[in-house]
Amino acid sequence: MALSLYRPDLEVNNTAQTRLTSQYDNLDQLSSAFKVKHTTQSYQAQFASLYYLRLAKLKKLTQNRSIEKWNEIPGQSQKPKFYSRVLDVDQNQLSYVVGTVYMDMKLKPNVLDDLARNKEAEANGIKHWVAAPQPTEKIYSDNDELCLEDESGRIKLVGPIIANTQLVTGIIIGVLGIEKDPGEFTVLDVCYPGVPPQPSKSASMDSDKSPLVAIVSGLRLGSQVANDALARRMFIDFISGRQGGSADQGLSSRITRLVIAGNCMSPPVAHVDDKKPKRFGQDQASFTSLPSTDFDNFLVELSSYVEIDILPGPDDPAGTLLPQQPFPKAMFKRAHDNFEQGSIVCHTNPTWFSIDETRLLVSSGQTIDDCFKYVRGDSRLGLAVDSLKWRHIAPTAPDTLWCYPFTDKDPFILNECPHIFVNGNQSQFETELVEGPEGQQARVVNLPQFTETSTIAIVNLDTLECQPVTFTTSDGASKADGDDKENDKSGAKVEDDGEDLIPDDDSAGEL
């Protein structure tokens, strides 16, 4: 189904439609865990404490689920025995144990290897530092070893079952199996902490008039690419309801909030004047302020139509450690009053908040990007879905994903299941409705960068149905599949994913 923002056959309705409003809650009881106070910041602690906190929090839960699952196995005369420590497992005994997954990966960057290369270079008379290897999208290889560890030690996991299970370093699991050879545990089954409980929410009786939330990532304001600017202009006109007929405006009037999930601004580019004489050690590169200025202007314009939630991303001017802290309001001179009025909210990355009792967990994508390095497959959506049953959204932190060295909590543990789970800045649009064993329903959305695909997502807050909206231009028609090649004017395409959020042209304009 296509939604054209520029349709000459459709009379534009200049009568402004009243935008729906929603109840908003920043969920301090959940989101505050991601906030690092400047007064208590300390980087003196070791990262190992984070693993112990994670294991202490999830071990008992996983143990209870393992006992429930394996206490008695149909058709098995031998009753499995539970061991509380991995090094206590007896040989040739059907047993199960709970611990933290650790993947010993040959391709994983290692600072000790870097130091060894530098020492070797110095021994060979090389006086400069050896360059570090280039980062790769994958660090997985067939020679990797999978281990399970706890406070007692580590045991190697082997067998076809575990080899074909998608795991990453840092998750807590229970494994059923037999230690046939010393130090090697042949896995027969795996148990996870499971999807956490989910708060109930009321649903609207008329889903065609339910409020919607629009989600975008990778806007990269300040980019000088002409097609990016045109797509953003179309996006603004769509959200504000200034484009199209009554059906299009009816859709935009149901959007109660806009979520910007990271990479809001274009990365700065250094400019050095090559013509002026060089004074080594004193030359300074100059940077343009265009990205922050453009983002400021963008927020001022859109916040007059819809309330906005902002998360920093990996390429934004924010700290590199997770959780990234909110943008300072001082960055936005023109939009400052909008922050004070509450129409714009700056969040940590990741963050929690709710709209009309629908709870959203939003990340700018670093967590999925890092987990993706560990697995053989290419499904980023599968990793996002697995995060729910792992009850953890950043298991590879702090091993390969930089994070703050928390000493009293692991904020990335999921104590409850969100209704909408968003990961921004992914390679493509993907979505799935996950249903848990206790009636949980979570809409998982992986969203690509807007500058790459000109795509946003719209989610119905009542039904959790989701559709991508792709804005295309005649110069960038390759950005969206299924473009109307007979129409030379700019348009937008809505890809169907289960629910028609956009009515046909012969409808009355209500959705």
Q: Where does each model-flagged region fall?
A:
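Extended recognition/assembly regions associated with phosphoester-bond processing machinery
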Residues: 1-511
